[in-house]
Amino acid sequence: MKATHLTSHWQLFLDDSLIERATGFDQRIRQPRKHGILFPDRQPWEHGIGMFQPVYDDGRFHAIYRVNWLDPEIEAFHASQGWKGDPADLGAATEWAYATSSDGIHWERPALLLCETPVFRDGKISGRTRENNCGVPFDFIRDLGRDGNVTDPARRFLLRTRTGQGTPAGRSHHAQARNPGGLYFAAEFPDFVHDPDWQRKLMPINGRMSPRGFGNFTGWDDLNGEWIAFMQGTAPRWFPARDIARHWSKDFKTWESRGVLYPDALDPHTLEHYDEFMEIQVIRKGDLWLGFMAVFHSDRTSPDYMPPFIEKENFRFAYDLPNYCTRKGTTDLRLVTSRDGGHTWNRVANRQAWLPHGANDDDFDRCAYTGTPITVGETDHFYYMAKNGDHLESLHDRTPYYKDRTTGWNAALASYPRDRYVSISTGTYPAILYTRPMLLPPGGLRLNADASHGEIRVEIAAAPAGGIDDIHSAPVEEGFSFHDCTPVQGNGVEQPVRWRRRPDTAALQGHPVRLRFYVRNADLYGFRIEAS
């Protein structure tokens, strides 16, 4: 068996690519702790909140997000352009707002004084004010250095500027989609409030985002040498269910795409509960890509749940499949991983929900949508979009689904110890995990584990390239036995493993070995070699 060259990245047990044998272990998904919504006190211009995009730079959290409100000026502008559709949608003014935080939990929305937003009285616009946090001059930002596998510090951030600010076209989602701004790399979060030369410090990109959209750009795929993005496939790929597509480009100019993640025979597919893949956010995590996928548990029992832009006589599409494009249902988040640049995917932990949606119809996250984590110290802050009701807002005849209340989206926060997504665990009866052959870099072994009620020991054995390779009887490398190993008995995301006579793995260079983990009443999340 060919040995895997390990890097100093964390090796997480999100898949079994490094596991040879794990008899006697349980695989346990670890659901994060929910903290609720970030902005319970909505401002008048925050009729809707969406696309919350947080980053962490120079010791501080920054976020931009989309807000909207109903505005007769925008409705008149859309009418002048001949656009048709849902009246509520055509009357929606869109702006981009800014929030900041020192701890990632408590957020401030400073008055930027950059643009006007409405003042409401008795539900109607009675004036305008600049005392708001709106007017952000870009509508997308992505930390490619943290999440996107980009090592050049000058290209750490990717952002897209806006067009037509201060005009109706600049506040029209429809107009912005047809006339997007320019793409840029940046070395730091742009100080667009205090620095008049902020845009001159950007590195322009002569190109465009993927044809599907810009909200879920992923990063650089070094394996295939291309920029990649993953998101819901375009209609009519919604037939027979929503799915996930991979988009790629060598130069940001020419984009190609194909579907890569589809619901399969193991996913529920009854009219009452038909699973679809609504959306995904993907980040680089060590040597793999980790996806946070929103699974839509759709209800197809009535044609009234179909969108108004599809005529009822076309509901069955080309085949006898009723109500295939429903909007009624809930969403939760599942984990998926890829080691080939997103061409193939692994469904993590038997497809269990990692971030479940709220159990009650009026819970703040009855629909839990995609997001990304930001790691600070030993904690991952996971920011996601949440809706306090069903995904369905209006029926096919455009009447509201909820007759007694108004639902909406908000930004929400969950947290968990760093990288603790899935554990390999045992109870009081111990077990031994055997890895596949690997070539280790020189350095100290570190564990992300909770062994506070038990113990973990590590042994390193030879993995000969030829002849009989028996994972049980292979000789132990001198000084690296279970007996030589000091038990790990704490709870921490980076605990050192020590052998009495071997401070690190420097003596093991050049030949393949296997790690053996003895685990008793403990949870093991991952390991890495810290370079010496």
Label the model's feature ranges.
Residues 1-532:
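Carbohydrate-active catalytic/glycan-binding domains of CAZyme proteins
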